[in-house]
Amino acid sequence: MKRMTKIVSLLLVALLLFGCTKIPTTTPDLSGVASDTAVLTEAALAEIKALGESPDDNYRTFYEVFVYSFCDSDGDGIGDLNGLTSKLDYLQNLGITGIWLMPIHPSQSYHKYDVADYYDIDPQYGTLEDFDAFMAACSERGINVITDLVLNHTGNDHEWFLTAVDYLKNLPEGAEPNAEDCKYVGYYYFNQEGGSGWHQIPGTNWYYEGQFSPHMPDLDLANAQVRAEITSIMEFWIDRGVSGFRLDAVKEFYSGNIAANVEVLSWIQETATSIKEDCYLVGECWDSFGAVSQYYTSGLTSFFDFPFGNSNGKIASVIRAAGTANTVSSYAKALQQANEAYSAANPDYIDAPFLSNHDVGRIAGFVNRDENKMKMAAAMNILMSGSCFIYYGEEIGMLGSGNDPSKRAPMYWNAARDNGTTNPPPECELPDEYPLGSLEEQIGDDSSLYNYYRQVIAIRNAMPVIARGNTTAEEALNINCISAQRKTWGEEECIILMNINTEAAQVDLSAYADWTLAASLSADGGEIALDAGSLSLPAFGTAILVPAA
C-alpha cells in the first residue's frame, strides 16, 4: 500500500491548495489553458501524475466531440480538425485521456452519419493530412482517439449504393439481381414489394431498406464482401493511429434480433483485435439493463451504459430524488448489480458510463440547471468504473434539448462567441443564456463547474482503482442519504461516499478506524473532514477513503 499512501498524501496537499488558493482571473488564451489557472496547482498535479499515473490501457477519460460545433479554425463558421487540434491543450489540462470523434467522413448531412466515403475526411472538416496532424498532436499528449464507425447503413450517395442502383435501373424487366454481375447489389437489401422502412428507387419497381432514413440505405452485414470492406476500413484507420471505434446503432443491425446482432459484434471484436490486439470498441446499445447484459456476451469490450445515463437513467433519477433515502441507497446496489451482470457476460468488459450525448438532452436540463446537482452528476459519472465519457460542453453546464441540432450547439468558449466559436448547426435553437456562463467566465472561478470537473478527473486519473475496481455496495455505510460503494482492484481498495442530499451529514466511521480520507469533492464549498471517526459531508459532497498505511 506504499504507493497508494504517497498518492493520498499528495492528493491531500493538492486539495488543501485548492481550498486556499484563489485562481488568477487573467483571461487565458483559450487555445489551451494557462498553467496558472489550474484547480490543483501544476506542481501538485505533476507529483500526482508521477506517482499515481494510471496504466496505459483502455480505461480512459473520454471526451465526445462533434467537430462541426467545436472549434472553427478558418472562419467559415464550421468546426474543423485544425480547430480541434488547437484545443488539445485545453482538453489535456481538463484531464482528458481519450477523444471520441463523431463521424468525420464525407457526407451530405451536417451530422455525417450518412457516410459517402469511409476512407476520407469531409472537406468541411479538413483533409487526411489535417487528420494525421491531429493524431500526432494527440499522441504527444497521451490522448487516445476513437472514431465513429457507422456500419448499419451508408449514405445514399455512397459509390456502393449508387452503383447498385444504376445496375437495378438497367436490369431487364423480370430479371433477378445477380451479385456476380454487380457485387454491390448484394451489399444492401432490395425487393419489389416495399414495406415499412423501404423506399422506392425512382423510375423503377425496386425498393431498398433504410430504416432510419431514405438517405441511409441499410447494409447487409452478413454479406462476406461487406465484411471484407469493414475489415479494410478498420485497417485503414488503425494504420493512421486510431485506438478503436465507437459502433453506431448496434441493436439496429438486425432490429429486434439480439442473437443476430451479437454474432455481428462478435465478428467485429475478433476482427478488430486481430488487426490491433488492444483495439478498443464501444457499442451504442440504447436499450434496457437486461438487453445490454445480453449484448456483452458478444465479447465486445464496452457498451454505453444507458441504464445509468440519459434523463431517465439511474444517475439522473437518483439526483432528482435527492434526500430520499431508499432511492439514494439503491444507487450503489445498482452499480454492484451492473458489475455482476456485465462481468458474468464478459469477464473482460469495460463499462462506458456517460451522462448525455449528441442524441439526448444535456445533464444541465435533467437537473433543472442546479449547479450543485450538475457537480454531483459529474462525480457519479466520472467515478464509475470503466471508461467514462463526457460530452463536449458538459463541463461548463451547456444546455441542449428539443430537436437533435439543439443538442449539438456550438461549444461556448466565451460570451463574445469568437475565438473559434462556430455557427449553430441548421435548425439549432440556442438558449437565451447559459446559466453558468462560458468557459472564459468559469476558468478563473475556483468554485465553477469547470474547475470541479478538473478536480474530479484529476482524482480519477491519479487513483487507478477508481476506473478499474470491481464495485460492491458498502452496506454498513449505504444508509440514510449516503451512497456508499467499495472498489477493489488487485491489492488496492477505496470506498466512495456520496451525500446525495440537500443537507449536510455526519457519517459514523468508527468501524473504519483503519481507513483514511484520500480525496474529497465539495459541490458547495462546505468543509469535508474526518475527525475522531466522524466524517463531515456537506450537501452533494463526496469523500474517497483508502486503507491507512
Question: Where on the chain are the PLM-derived regions?
Answer:
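Bacterial N-terminal signal peptides that target proteins for export
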Residues: 1-8
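Hydrophobic core
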Residues: 12, 16-17
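Acidic/aromatic-lined carbohydrate-recognition and catalytic surfaces
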Residues: 20-24, 29-228, 239, 250-298
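Active-site-proximal helices and loops of the catalytic beta/alpha 8
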Residues: 29-45, 135-136, 152-153, 158-178, ...
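Loop/helix patches that line or flank the sugar-binding groove of alpha-linked glycan CAZymes
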Residues: 40, 58, 336, 354-357, ...
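Structural recognition of the beta-strand scaffold that forms the well-ordered cores
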Residues: 62-64, 98-103, 146-147, 246, ...
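Beta-strand-rich binding/interaction modules
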Residues: 504-523
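C-terminal beta-strand-rich structural cap/linker in extracellular carbohydrate-active enzymes
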Residues: 530-549
